[in-house]
Design a protein with these regions (language model features):
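Conserved ABC ATPase "signature" region
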Residues: 116, 123-141, 193
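The feature captures the beta-strand-to-loop junction immediately N-terminal to the Walker
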Residues: 53-55
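A short, proline-enriched helix->beta-strand linker immediately N-terminal to the Walker B motif
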Residues: 164-168
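Helix-to-loop junction immediately C-terminal to a conserved catalytic motif
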Residues: 68
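Conserved ABC ATPase signature
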Residues: 145-149, 153
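Conserved ABC transporter NBD signature motif
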Residues: 76-88
Length: 269
């Protein structure tokens, strides 16, 4: 198992005592001559919920796409508890649920599809999906097809599909951006419950600062390109979080601080 030197996240109080699950060192990436990441380092603690926030075009989605192997790096090293990506299972929830689910498959079949690709026998696939659904207390009709379901239900199916392989890490790329506000609130609650039950290391990209602070154990704030860590804010708020969290003085202070960092980066030339 490979080991890389731990780098305490700047501004993340208490992070030094937490073992890194994802270790990024010397990450490089450019598109058409534009440098997105240049010798970028990052540690993500095990079993924590990390949200990624920053200016438009700074490379938020690119970061999780690089870490998850969806796009190749131009250099650097990424390890998962000392292991290479090929040695770990990951789950990924895409931004557009309408394009992520297969419309000719029922919700249940969509969820079990990754297990079919892994050559898991049918009986075991059914058992694993049912066990996951029961464990998380999901109350939707999985015999329905995606086009028969609400947006939130479709995105929940996408999340279940990502979780059915029992991933070490779950990545979510702006999973609520295509949902209306009411459904976004519902899905925040669902995702919190899933995280509480599984304690899967979770990395979520968000364009909504309130959402980023509300869901996170840590908020990773990025600078403009080439992206650096502007701050890595530890959000010390009790879970389960609800409407009362939004009015809590500590939440308001965390959000104010993150907004200040964000605005500073937006104004930076």
């Amino acid at each position: 198992m490979l080991q890389l030197k731990s780098i305490p996240p700047a501004g993340a109080a208490g992070a030094m005592s937490e073992p890194a699950h994802i270790t990024v060192r010397g990450l490089n990436k450019e598109f058409n001559g534009s440098v997105v990441y240049d010798n970028f380092d990052l540690d993500i603690p095990r079993g924590r919920f990390v949200t990624v926030f920053g200016p438009n075009g700074c490379g938020k989605s690119t970061l999780i796409n690089l870490i998850s192997g969806l796009i190749p790096t131009d250099g650097g090293e990424i390890l998962f508890g000392g292991k290479r990506l090929s040695q770990v299972k990951i789950g990924y929830v895409f931004q557009n649920y309408r394009e992520a689910l297969f419309p000719w498959m029922s919700a249940f079949t969509n969820i079990e599809y990754p297990l079919e690709l892994m050559k898991v026998p049918k009986k075991e696939r059914v058992e694993r999906v049912q066990r996951l659904v029961d464990h998380l207390g999901v109350r939707i009709d999985l015999t329905l097809y995606p086009y028969q379901m609400s947006g939130g239900q479709q995105q929940l199916v996408s999340i279940l599909r990502a979780l059915v392989v029992e991933p070490e890490v779950l990545f979510l790329d702006e999973p609520f951006s295509a949902l209306d506000y009411e459904m976004s609130l519902f899905m925040r609650d669902q995702l919190q419950r899933i995280f509480h039950e599984t304690r899967t290391t979770t990395v979520l990209v968000s364009h909504d600062l309130e959402e980023a602070v509300y869901l996170a154990d840590y908020v990773l704030l990025l600078t403009r390109r080439p992206a650096r860590i502007a701050d890595y804010r530890y959000i010390e708020l009790p879970r389960h979080r609800g409407d009362e969290t939004l009015a809590h003085p500590d939440f308001i202070e965390h959000k104010r601080h993150c907004l200040e960092v964000f605005q500073r980066e937006v104004r930076r030339q």
